[in-house]
């Protein structure tokens, strides 16, 4: 590894969430929740990522990252304070860029104010406009009804504070017929609250028949919808990414909520899951890659910063 090589890491901070999206793969069993890193170890992980593994882009995800520890917002803001010393906007080579992946329901204005200067991009998940469709997915119920109206208010507040805005959507049979209306909706406010990037995922099967039966989508149908979306967005300034199952499988190296990296590789025709030691036990990214037995070129394709 060249000492100048910098990397991006996706950190699933918690399996917990305030919503219950049916396609989500998070494990909320008592043992999984109990294994979440304590506050001090989260800070330790940040230091190791920055100093030892030369990570310069960190995506904070979940579950819902604003719900780490099962506590709304408080512990997440403590982590933000721990990240702040690694922000060096005057020196792009050493600046730790932060992306927050969230459903945005906990992103009140006072929370957003505390993210200024630390978080660079806020990525919001949005899968449909239709309230019934969102309810079927698990995004529009109880105290979180009116999901789309809340989303619109949130992005106005996010844009006002100068954050870059990105969207994530998962393409499934449940929302398949609603997606073009969603795209038209987003394009309608592009002049006032510009979305810079939008990523569309193919639902990833996890060998869970109860979920796969509902959410699995044929490769050809996924490709057809991606083509329709690309056509509709032609001429806009939104950078589109379409991530199918193969691309997701190839790029799947994540930092877990219990402080270890997980990755997958092929062995004798089987997909094998590998789990590292605690992240702070590694002195370099090369050491971590060897331990996980990942294809170094493939890893660098998705995780080395250009």
Model-predicted segments: where are they?
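Residue-level recognition of short loop/turn positions
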Residues: 20, 62, 102, 257-258
